[in-house]
């Protein structure tokens, strides 16, 4: 007859009984004093063998083993029992679930005190067995250990002893223990008893207890009854780890001595609620409720009086809605680490932390709490050193009040990253900030960021700080930001930003790449003269569609790249660049003015790269720039190739001047000038011819004027200006 494992009946994340229900046709396990009782099954009506093993440490009485099939064995006056019994088919008590049960009793004769330790009962693998689960393998269903008079100690229910013995405790369903014991440890006692459904613990224990891993991986466990007096329990680490079917647990209020609750309920997928006892002595709650997917609420009646680690405590408990804390803690100097404590609690809507909780770190504390709308932090947390990722992707958060400033500098990196509904933030006085990267990245609704007087800064980088703050209309950087080295993408995609005030002391900034990229609203910006250290202006004003004018200060003498700096600034009319000395190190202007269709006045563009050895105004580096008709481009740099091809790259230039007449600038095999399909008039082309003629004895060069607007109006005399010098005109 087929055997249905208890595991198959009970292990379910969403269905099955909430408490243990014992089959009515099992033989009764009684509370017999001075006895150890087992109930086991044979997985079918077949011959099977059971081996018992006990260690007797005192006393001299005979040990009687009642095998439950009307036979007994007597072990006399020896310290150790190691007895094997073979059952005959047809004996035992049939069970409606399809197997036969046997009740084994182990007891004593005579008087006096005897002690049994290491009480084990194991199935013997029949020689005909080929795999676990074959009908010849027996399984213990229940176990009862008699009262403390005999002190029978259960140890290692899961152990495998010898190559021919298999642990039968994977199908153990119920365990009842003596009322009074003096055991000092339950560590790993029921570890991996996969089918264990209920355990009744002793009502009294006179010794200090360690429960670490006691029920670890008992994923069918439904019910655990602790004694009402549990004052001596000290270690609860990993006790219920992976008890996936445990739905509720009652922890006695007397369980107030435990120092370690780390990973206690880790992976209890169906646990709904827990009221914690006093945890005054606790120093570890790390991963205590990690990945408790159905957990709805937890109540803390007190908080530790010593420093405690709550890192990852509730992480990924996706259904957690409420955590009750006391209003205050009794020892405000005791620090609490909340690193990633509530990360991934997607149903958590509001939380109130004790007003004087001294949090040492808020790093990632509420990251991905997507339903969080309100969070009341402590009024002060002087030991806090980190706020990085605190509210990362809290997409429902509307407002937050930060605690008073801690004593040390703190990181705000990605603190509000992705808080798309956050509207206002005030940083209180006294904060010393050391990292501001991505702090308000994608805060689409942020309108106001206030720095109260007294905020100090040790910030060296503001990369992506306000990127994507669509509703931010103005911002004034504090004057104390004088050591910031990077503003890369700091204000990019701030679509409503109309004004920004930069401090006069940006002397440490080296990277302004994409700083204002995509700011379609503001029309002008004043850059401070202190930016002498800056080297990177790439994409700085990319797609600033409303920018009409810009003047770069004469102090930016170390810039090396303007790659796509004003790309897509289609309203830009005036751009004033610094002089030759300030632009001498520039080596990349690719796309610098691409799409600047309204640019009329461009000052000092001819000075770019004037002191470098590599020419810039070439097809590779210049042709992607586009200018409005009417602008004048004057070239000064060391040119070996000038390409302004209006057809291929839409370079809409009307006037080109060559200002450097040094013959040394025209070396190479066949350098040429290409102004094809530009809008240059006849007079402007003639003016360019005169510039070319002034190149001294440079001969055998080519100028291509095909398709240029004024090419058709050139006279023979006009052409002679350059051909008489040995130049060739194409077009």
Which residues make up each language-model segment?
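Extracellular/surface-exposed low-complexity segments
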Residues: 2-5, 9-13, 710-731
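Enriched but not universal
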Residues: 1-35
């Amino acid at each position: 007859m087929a055997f249905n494992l208890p595991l198959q009946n009970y292990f379910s994340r969403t269905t099955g009984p909430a408490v243990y229900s014992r089959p009515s046709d099992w033989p009764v396990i009684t509370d017999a004093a001075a006895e150890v009782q087992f109930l086991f099954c044979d997985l079918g009506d077949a011959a099977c063998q059971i081996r018992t093993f006990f260690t007797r440490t005192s006393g001299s009485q005979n040990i009687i083993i009642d095998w439950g099939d009307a036979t007994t064995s007597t072990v006399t006056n020896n310290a150790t029992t190691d007895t094997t019994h073979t059952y005959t088919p047809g004996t035992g008590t049939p069970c409606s679930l399809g197997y036969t049960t046997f009740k084994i009793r182990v007891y004593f004769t005579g008087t006096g005190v005897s002690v049994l330790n290491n009480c084990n009962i194991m199935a013997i693998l029949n020689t005909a067995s080929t795999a676990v689960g074959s009908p010849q393998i027996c399984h213990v269903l229940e176990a009862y250990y008699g009262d403390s008079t005999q002190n029978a100690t259960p140890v290692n229910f899961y152990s495998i002893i010898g190559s021919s013995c298999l642990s039968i405790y994977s199908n153990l369903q119920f365990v009842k223990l003596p009322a009074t014991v003096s055991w000092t440890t339950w560590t790993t006692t029921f570890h991996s008893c996969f089918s264990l459904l209920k355990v009744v613990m002793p009502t009294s224990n006179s010794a200090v207890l360690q429960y670490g891993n006691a029920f670890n991986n008992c994923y069918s466990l439904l019910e655990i009854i602790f004694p009402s007096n549990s004052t001596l329990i000290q270690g609860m680490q990993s006790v219920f780890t992976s008890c996936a079917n445990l739905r509720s647990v009652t922890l006695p209020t007397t369980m107030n001595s435990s120092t370690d609750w780390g990973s206690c309920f880790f992976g209890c997928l169906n646990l709904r609620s827990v009221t914690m006892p006093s945890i005054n002595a606790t120093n570890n709650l790390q991963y205590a409720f990690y990945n408790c997917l159905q957990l709805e609420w937890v109540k803390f009646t007190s908080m530790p009086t010593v420093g405690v680690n709550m890192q990852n405590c509730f992480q990924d408990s996706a259904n957690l809605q409420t955590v009750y804390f006391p209003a205050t803690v009794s020892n405000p100097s005791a620090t609490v680490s909340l690193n990633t404590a509530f990360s991934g609690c997607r149903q958590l809507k509001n939380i109130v932390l004790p007003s004087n909780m001294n949090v040492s770190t808020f790093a990632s504390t509420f990251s991905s709490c997507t339903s969080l709308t309100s969070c009341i932090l402590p009024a002060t947390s002087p030991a806090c050193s980190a706020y990085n990722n605190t509210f990362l992707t809290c997409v429902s958060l509307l407002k937050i009040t930060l605690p008073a400033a801690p004593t040390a500098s703190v990181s705000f990196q990605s603190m509000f990253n992705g808080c798309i509904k956050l509207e206002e933030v005030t940083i209180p006085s006294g904060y010393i900030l050391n990292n501001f990267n991505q702090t308000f990245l994608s805060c689409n609704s942020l309108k106001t960021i206030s720095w109260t007087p007294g905020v100090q800064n040790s910030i060296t980088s503001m990369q992506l700080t306000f990127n994507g703050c669509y509703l931010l209309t103005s911002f004034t950087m504090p004057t104390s930001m004088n050591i910031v080295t990077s503003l890369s993408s700091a204000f990019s995609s701030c679509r409503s930003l109309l004004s920004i005030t930069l401090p006069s002391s940006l002397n440490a900034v080296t990277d302004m790449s994409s700083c204002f990229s995509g700011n379609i609203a503001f029309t002008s910006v004043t850059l401070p003269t202190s930016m002498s250290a800056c080297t990177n202006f790439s994409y700085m004003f990319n797609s600033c569609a409303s920018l009409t004018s810009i003047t770069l200060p004469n102090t930016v003498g170390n810039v090396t790249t303007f790659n796509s700096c004003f790309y897509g600034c289609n309203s830009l009319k005036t751009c004033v660049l610094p002089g030759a000395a300030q632009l001498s190190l520039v080596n990349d202007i690719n796309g610098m003015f691409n799409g600047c269709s309204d640019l009329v006045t461009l000052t000092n563009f001819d000075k770019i790269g004037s002191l470098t050895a590599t020419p810039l105004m070439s097809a590779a580096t210049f042709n992607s720039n586009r200018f409005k008709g009417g602008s004048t481009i004057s070239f000064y740099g060391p040119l070996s190739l000038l390409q302004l091809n209006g057809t291929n790259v839409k370079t809409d230039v009307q006037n080109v001047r060559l200002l450097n007449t040094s013959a040394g600038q025209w070396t190479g095999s066949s350098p040429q000038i290409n102004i094809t399909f530009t809008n240059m008039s006849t007079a402007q082309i003639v003016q360019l011819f005169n510039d070319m003629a002034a190149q001294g004895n440079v001969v055998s060069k080519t100028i291509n004027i095909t398709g240029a607007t004024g090419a058709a109006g050139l006279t023979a005399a006009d052409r002679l200006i350059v051909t008489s010098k040995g130049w060739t005109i194409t077009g």
